[in-house]
A protein has these predicted regions:
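Bacterial N-terminal signal peptides that target proteins for export
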Residues: 1-13
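Bacterial N-terminal signal peptides
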Residues: 11-21
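Second-shell loop/turn segments in exported
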Residues: 42-49, 69, 94-100, 167-168
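Beta-edge loop/turn motif
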Residues: 54-130, 176-183
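Aromatic/histidine-rich interaction motifs
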Residues: 100-165, 187, 197-198
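Edge beta-strand at a domain terminus
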Residues: 175-180, 185-198
Length: 198
């Protein structure tokens, strides 16, 4: 009886070892294969905004303000794009019910602040150090600070009185870079700065 148990145990161990050796496979490459991390959209920023249902309030705001040409421009820019959730919060916080209720001068100023005059892609080596905001000029003449955390989550106006997190970053249309976020952003003075506007 002992011999039978011993034989069965040895047989099972042998079969187990044989199966474990057969199930091993050779890895083709021991180096990490990098994939491109930017999504090339092959369209203008305006075409992307028009084709995305979650940006319908932003699209309507651009049309009411008649700023479509700024989103079709051929020179590069960075487009900070608030999604529908952002506009719902903006409506609630500011007492508006629709885009049409926002006075056009306020709407134009807000939209121009959401266009940075430089291409800011968070894969840029100049932005490699985390938590180091860089000042950029916007189309309305104010300054926007862009940076990222150590986990490469994009931040707007870090180090100021109010900062925001970017939800989706580094979308690359033909005319710049798009960063989508859940908030309508505004100029925020650097912490300790008593000036209302630069």
């Amino acid at each position: 009886m002992r011999n039978i148990k011993y034989t069965i145990t040895r047989s099972l161990l042998g079969i187990g070892m044989l199966l474990s050796i057969v199930s091993c496979e050779i890895q083709d490459s021991f180096t990490y294969d990098y994939a491109p991390d930017n999504t090339k959209l092959n369209m203008s920023a305006w075409a992307f905004i028009q084709g995305n249902d979650s940006l319908s309030f932003f699209r309507e705001a651009i049309q009411v303000a008649q700023l479509e040409s700024m989103y079709e421009a051929t020179e590069g820019a960075t487009y900070i794009v608030p999604n529908n959730q952002a506009f719902r919060s903006y409506f609630k916080d500011n007492g508006y019910s629709t885009i049409a209720n926002i006075p056009v001068p306020i709407l134009k100023n807000m939209l121009r602040y959401h266009i940075v005059k430089s291409i800011v892609n968070f894969n840029d080596p100049a932005l490699a150090p985390s938590n180091k905001p860089i000042a950029y000029d916007t189309e309305n003449g104010q300054t926007m600070y862009l940076s990222h955390t150590s986990t490469y989550v994009g931040l707007i106006n870090e180090g100021t009185n109010r900062q925001w997190q970017i939800r989706t970053s580094n979308l690359v249309p033909d005319n710049g870079v798009i960063h989508v976020l859940n908030a309508v952003v505004y100029y925020s003075a650097p912490t300790g700065d008593v000036n209302v506007n630069p």
